[in-house]
Amino acid sequence: MILFPAIDLKGGQCVRLKLGDMQQATVYNTDPAAQAKSFEDQGFEWLHVVDLDGAFAGHSANGDAVEAILKATKNPVQLGGGIRTLDHIEAWLSRGLRRVILGTVAVRNPELVIEACRKFPGRVAVGIDAKGGKVAVEGWAEASELGIIELAKKFEGAGVAAIIYTDIDRDGILTGINWSSTLELADAVSIPVIASGGLASLNDIKRMLQPDARKLEGAISGRALYDGRIDPKEALALINANRAKETA
């Protein structure tokens, strides 16, 4: 299991939203690159970055901040938000991203995702953001009639590296991960699933280490880390101890 610390970018700053609402943004760090280095120094193995402005605009809007993050950390970085074309994907991967996350385009043009997986094997993830059980697009601003599992199944066998599943109704409000829908999705597809939205405490980390949740690749944590509700050392110690136990 991997715990992915999150950096959400708005106006070049590191922020957290509540329920995906751009009007409810709390600034946590004005220097995203320094935040990325801090997460690396704390012992995290990966970094999850979202260009919030880009998600709404439909194109990269915090490119300078992302470039600075890539220079500041040796950790692999996954980026989502506003990446909608093969050219955008190739440009970001060539700059050092480990993988891109495709959200809106996965709904609008699933064939592009499949083509991207062929062209960049192991480096394309799909972001499924859901509200009320239905997939949301355009930076969570628009709801679709598409079901979560219905969308995920479109990419079975395509080579998608992971599905990042976000429950918008829980994002940024520290109410705990929506375990029922997250595990239902993980059971329905062979693609690794990463849980996002609502991770609130070490109890969520412990829950992820239970046998029925081991199919998950990991979870993303934002506000709980920034607000000090999760101690990085304690969380990573739990994860590493579990990893050692599984490989013993």
Curated annotation (Swiss-Prot):
EC class: isomerase
UniProt-listed InterPro entries: Aldolase_TIM (IPR013785), His_biosynth (IPR006062), HisA_bact_arch (IPR006063), Isoase_HisA-like (IPR044524), Isoase_HisA-like_bact (IPR023016), Rhodanese-like_dom (IPR001763), RibuloseP-bd_barrel (IPR011060)
Principal location listed in the UniProt entry: cytoplasm
Catalytic activity: 1-(5-phospho-beta-D-ribosyl)-5-[(5-phospho-beta-D-ribosylamino)methylideneamino]imidazole-4-carboxamide = 5-[(5-phospho-1-deoxy-D-ribulos-1-ylimino)methylamino]-1-(5-phospho-beta-D-ribosyl)imidazole-4-carboxamide
SUPFAM superfamilies, per the entry: Ribulose-phoshate binding barrel (SSF51366)
Entry-linked NCBIfam families: 1-(5-phosphoribosyl)-5-[(5-phosphoribosylamino)methylideneamino]imidazole-4-carboxamide isomerase, PRK13585.1
Protein name: 1-(5-phosphoribosyl)-5-[(5-phosphoribosylamino)methylideneamino] imidazole-4-carboxamide isomerase
Source organism: Rhizobium etli (strain ATCC 51251 / DSM 11541 / JCM 21823 / NBRC 15573 / CFN 42)
